[in-house]
């Protein structure tokens, strides 16, 4: 899980979602998981 101020899709399988008011990226590739902090 990377914590970034700007979350971006890193590949075409990445999905940008909102959970509990936080913007997150979920993906099939675990290296692409990100959340805004």
From Swiss-Prot:
MF terms (GO), sorted A to Z: structural constituent of ribosome
Pfam families xrefs: Ribosomal_L36 (PF00444)
GO cellular component, one term: ribonucleoprotein complex
Protein's GO biological process: translation
Record-annotated membrane-spanning stretches: none
Ribosomal protein is among the record's keywords: yes
Keywords from the named record: Ribonucleoprotein, Ribosomal protein
HAMAP family, per database record: Ribosomal_bL36
Homology family: Belongs to the bacterial ribosomal protein bL36 family.
Name of the protein: Large ribosomal subunit protein bL36
Organism: Synechococcus sp. (strain CC9605)
Gene label: rpmJ
């Amino acid at each position: 899980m990377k914590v970034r101020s700007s979350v971006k899709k890193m590949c075409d399988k990445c999905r940008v979602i909102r959970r509990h008011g936080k913007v997150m990226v979920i993906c099939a590739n675990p290296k692409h998981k990100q959340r805004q902090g």
